[in-house]
């Protein structure tokens, strides 16, 4: 394998002594019996890669450090990370517009912040029609930020409102996380729904997609499954709007960081590797 520089567009770092991380509690959803594997501190130095691979940057996605004061997580990151990186901050999209704008102004005062993610989970069909969500996305549009989308597309029967939100906020780049959480059962009703919804979202030019999070769906995921999903995403979005990511440290449920990247790289045509593993993340997340 020739030398390859990776920019990882989806990782989480934990500081359990300073942050809250309520979701990491063993009695809090998700109720994973092996949650103890990731219930530890993780810092940038834990993103270990050996030659011929190297890590040249990353994107940190909010991890529940402090949902009420999400800037605390950004402050910690900017004090302790030395590789080029960008951060996606947590924020409650249902806040009053005045408070939402106040939070957004504080978050964007940090140089690493390029985007936001709703702190309360998936951007559901109900949330897409929430008056506060609609008005607050107009505010985000003024800032030209990224909005990360946690979407279980196989369970969403109607994404018309989501498509409308995306189409009317053209200054926002919307990035689908974890491939829209594809169902495990190919050719099931959920699988067909996932394909249909993904096809509709791909028509929006301000939408990109990250492929990762396989271990959340199946700790023993197979190569043919992930290869099929990556190939389908490239088919819909083209190689310019697809990124491959790790979801560190959750990938540790299945394998180590080095092993993960070697496995993912083997599923991608060499002609697409530079774009999917490096260039697209720099472009979409504006990593210096």
State where each predicted segment sits:
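Active-site gating/metal-coordination segments in enzymes
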Residues: 71-157, 208-215
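Mid-to-C-terminal alpha-helical segments outside catalytic/metal-binding sites
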Residues: 1-9, 16-49, 57, 232, ...
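Divalent metal-dependent hydrolysis catalytic cores, especially in the metallo-beta-lactamase
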Residues: 28-66, 84-92, 114-121, 145-147
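Hydrophobic faces of well-ordered beta-strands that scaffold small-molecule active sites
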Residues: 7-11, 57-61, 85-89, 114-118, ...
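Alpha-helical scaffolding within the catalytic cores
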Residues: 38-47, 72-73, 99-103, 159-162, ...
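Active-site environment of divalent metal-dependent phosphoester hydrolases
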Residues: 14-16, 65-68, 94-96, 121, ...
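Short, electropositive alpha-helical surface patch
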Residues: 68-83, 170-176, 226-236, 260-269
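Catalytic pocket-lining loop regions of alpha/beta-barrel enzymes
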Residues: 129-243
């Amino acid at each position: 394998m020739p030398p390859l520089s990776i920019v990882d567009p989806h990782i989480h770092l934990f500081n359990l002594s300073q942050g809250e991380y309520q979701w990491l509690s063993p009695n809090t959803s998700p109720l994973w019996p092996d949650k103890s594997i990731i219930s530890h501190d993780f810092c940038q130095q834990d993103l270990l890669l050996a030659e011929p691979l190297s890590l040249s940057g990353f994107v940190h996605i909010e991890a529940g450090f402090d949902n009420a004061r999400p800037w605390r997580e950004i402050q910690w990151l900017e004090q302790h990370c030395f590789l080029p990186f960008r951060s996606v901050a947590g924020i409650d999209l249902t806040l009053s517009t005045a408070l939402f704008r106040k939070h957004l102004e504080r978050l964007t005062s940090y140089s690493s912040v390029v985007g936001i993610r709703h702190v309360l989970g998936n951007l559901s069909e109900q949330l897409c029609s929430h008056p506060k969500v609609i008005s607050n996305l107009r505010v985000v549009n003024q800032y030209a930020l990224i909005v990360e989308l946690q979407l279980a597309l196989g369970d969403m029967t109607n994404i018309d409102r989501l498509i409308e939100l995306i189409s009317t906020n053209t200054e926002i780049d919307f990035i689908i996380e974890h491939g829209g959480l594809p169902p495990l059962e190919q050719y099931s009703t959920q699988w067909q729904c996932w394909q249909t919804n993904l096809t509709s979202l791909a028509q929006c030019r301000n939408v990109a997609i990250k492929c990762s999070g396989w271990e959340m769906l199946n700790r023993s995921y197979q190569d043919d499954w992930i290869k099929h999903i990556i190939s389908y995403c490239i088919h819909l979005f083209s190689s310019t709007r697809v990124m491959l990511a790790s979801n560190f440290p959750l990938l540790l449920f299945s394998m180590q960081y080095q092993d993960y990247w070697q496995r993912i790289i083997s599923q991608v045509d060499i002609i697409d590797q530079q774009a999917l593993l490096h260039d697209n993340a720099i472009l979409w997340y504006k990593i210096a």
